[in-house]
Amino acid sequence: MTQNPYDPLKRTDLSHREQVLLKFTAEVVHGTNLALIDTLVAPDYVQHTHGVGQGREGIRRYVTEISMRRAGREQWRPLLVFEDGDFVILYKLLPAFMIVDIVRFNAEDQLAEHWDIVQPLPAPGHDPMELSQHDFSRFYALFGVPRQG
């Protein structure tokens, strides 16, 4: 795997909210510590991920019914995390997917609102830190653009 100069696990300057999101992701989403939901997540948590319910109970149900039963759930690594105002963005790699989580925090530093983007890896063993090469094949297929020439 290509060295990641932005690796959140090696950074010493993480903000409090970046640390909270990493803890939540590691211990709740990819772990088994459901008790953290009651302290790290706002009671009126808003979920924008289609199919996942609202509030703490929505997260709890997703983790117990889906996340805890997902193959390879513990095999993940954060690639990038950054804070901008009330938002923290986490880019992470799983065995078959890349995911971007966008989280808004409330004044109590709890997760208050969530969006995500899930993308299958373009190829098995894909290294997202490796420099890209010119090959539009996946874009032709993804966007339905006819090839020229």
Write out the residue ranges for each language-model feature.
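C-terminal and inter-domain tail/linker signature
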Residues: 1-149
